[in-house]
Design a protein with these regions (language model features):
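Catalytic cores of RNA-modifying enzymes
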Residues: 1-168, 173, 205
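C-terminal lobe and adjacent flexible extensions of AdoMet/dcAdoMet transferase-like proteins
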Residues: 157, 175-205
Length: 205
């Protein structure tokens, strides 16, 4: 959300059009001073906002998001939820986010990273996009200072996924099962998630 509008005003000065999605009533009131046709304020929950309802064009998303809903927001923007009406991923070219430092490490992690960093969030984000860690931002950069460090990350959406998949929700289910119980072997993890034993064994052989 645009909050009090400090960053938003600078973006408005440089962009052709800015759509700001804000759910907080007080913030909505504080943003009334931005008066230009280039700025449109949307009073809504970002998790319930479909970009196709705003304008038939592509978007760049810039946000300093609440850290506790980072994963749901990314899932919504990248179309990772099982929702046939969610075409947000097709309308976004780039996402720039301020996130918790540990989340940033997970977003950019590859198979060579420590096991705690590489997982569901890493794979499903990088399946759709290239992720770049722009800068680590220390907690003392904010007032009041939070208890965690932050980082600025840039997510560039690819025109096509890295691998062609017919059923994205099935892929998500498989990846989630693989990382749900990291200390178990892969066969047991998939079987515990409800996958057919014979199919799992045959696939892994």
């Amino acid at each position: 959300g645009p909050g009090a509008g400090f960053v938003t005003e600078n973006i408005v000065n440089k962009a052709k059009k800015v759509y700001a999605v804000e759910i907080d009533e007080d913030a909505i009131e504080a943003l009334q001073h931005i008066k230009t046709d280039k700025f449109k304020l949307i009073h809504n929950d970002i998790l319930k906002t479909q970009l196709k309802e705003l304008e038939d064009t592509t978007f760049k998303v810039i946000a300093n998001i609440p850290y506790y809903i980072t994963s749901p927001i990314l899932a919504h923007l990248l179309g990772e939820i099982d929702d046939l009406n969610n075409d947000n991923r097709n309308r976004i070219t780039e996402i720039v986010l301020m996130v918790q430092w540990e989340v940033a490490q997970r977003l950019v992690a590859d198979e060579n990273a420590p096991s705690k960093q590489y997982g569901l969030l890493s794979i499903l984000t990088q399946f759709n996009a290239d992720v770049e860690l722009i800068q680590k931002v220390g907690r003392k950069s904010f007032y009041p200072a939070p208890k965690v460090d932050s980082a600025l990350v840039k997510i560039t959406i690819n025109n096509e996924p890295r691998v062609k998949v017919d059923d994205y929700s099935y892929l998500r289910r498989v990846v989630k099962a693989c990382f749900a119980t990291r200390r178990k072997n892969l066969k047991n993890s998939l079987m515990n998630a409800g996958f057919n034993k014979n199919a799992v064994v045959q696939t892994l052989q």
